[in-house]
Amino acid sequence: MTVLSEQDKIRLLADIVKIQTENDHEIEVCEYLKDLLSQYDIDSKIVKVNDSRANLVAEIGSGAPVLAISGHMDVVDAGDHDDWTFPPFELTDKDGKLFGRGTTDMKGGLMAMVIAMIELKQSNALKQGTIRLLATTGEETEQYGAQLLADEGYLDDVSGLIIGEPTSNIAYYAHKGSMSCVVTAKGKAAHSSMPHLGTNAVDILVDFVNEMKQEYKNIKEHDKVHELDAVPMIEKHLHRKIGEEESHIYSGFVMLNSVFNGGKQVNSVPHKATAKYNVRTVPEYDSTFVKDLFEKVIRHVGENYLTVDIPSSHDPVASDRDNPLIQNITRIAPNYVHEDIVVSALIGTTDASSFLGTNENNVDFAVFGPGESIMAHQVDEFIRKDMYLSYIDVYKDVFKAYLEK
């Protein structure tokens, strides 16, 4: 039973695209969704982070198993609106595409999940189990919305979790983690004409960076067996086969020194320098390994001068490659998207890191949502209209099939 027309489904997406949630104000989407769901007798609860940022939790059905479905409400900055062909916060329907900030990443996926819930509720299609919607704040920054929901127990009883990020018709059973590490070197300032009276923080930090580069090289020489296989994702996006060495990068541990700052002016010995690293963790080389590695190199180079801070750390999430969610997606989705579904690990990260940690409870897990991932964060972001609409039906069938397993 279809409750909403095609025009209704597009209008609902337009309504939440109009709400400007550039790294803030998700509570307005929460209030909109709460009102929408109440029209169909679906109870929901707003879980606040602060006055302007909040999550929304809603449920249909009852009892076990519990399937959590999740999407984030925040979007990245739209930049200069003059660079857009169409206004970024007005949904524009043109040439089979729905343009607007967040259409792909990921208000399209979120609204597809919400509509799927509504239509399942109205048709009394759920014979057993619970669908729990977790609409989150702050995914594009530090995942504090997802972490709050995890801390308050909303994931404690779940059997499965689907994240509706845009996946280009790829079903992800796992993804890498991500860490930000900031190394600071503190020396002693002096005039450049008398450098021996100071301690050059840049020199110290360069020594650290060079030694860490060698450590990373040594790690990659042994990083040959991977629990997470990201090769199918990469080969689909690149439209070519990749070699063994490339596969060890995509499926393995990755560390990048992306920022280096030191010194204030040319005629002074720099007293402070900082290097920032982004680290993509995997089960074989996790956050504990990374912390120990940084501390080891600091001890060797100069622990009296160097410190490390880790402002963010999100674990890799792994599940069985053929878990029941993945099985249902690969069986059902081709009927609607008219292509086979590739199964892969994801090289990025999602709210699942905060929801599940390292997934010690072996929750069935999938990242699968409408939209082409390459469109995320782009000027003139769009989602194909047919993809958005078809995923509503995909979700309905997948949710129902999973709960009836």
Swiss-Prot record:
Q: Which annotated residues bind Zn(2+) 1? A: 72, 105, 165
Q: What is this protein identified as?
A: Probable succinyl-diaminopimelate desuccinylase
Catalyzed chemical reaction(s) = N-succinyl-(2S,6S)-2,6-diaminopimelate + H2O = (2S,6S)-2,6-diaminopimelate + succinate
Q: Which cofactor does it need?
A: Zn(2+); Co(2+)
Q: Which BP terms in the Gene Ontology apply to this protein?
A: diaminopimelate biosynthetic process; lysine biosynthetic process via diaminopimelate
The entry's active site is: 74, 139
Return the similarity comment. Belongs to the peptidase M20A family.
Give the organism the record lists. Answer: Staphylococcus epidermidis (strain ATCC 12228 / FDA PCI 1200)
- The kind of enzyme this is, by top-level EC class, is hydrolase
Q: Which UniProt keywords apply?
A: Amino-acid biosynthesis, Cobalt, Diaminopimelate biosynthesis, Hydrolase, Lysine biosynthesis, Metal-binding, Zinc
Database matches in CDD domains: M20_ArgE_DapE-like (cd08659)
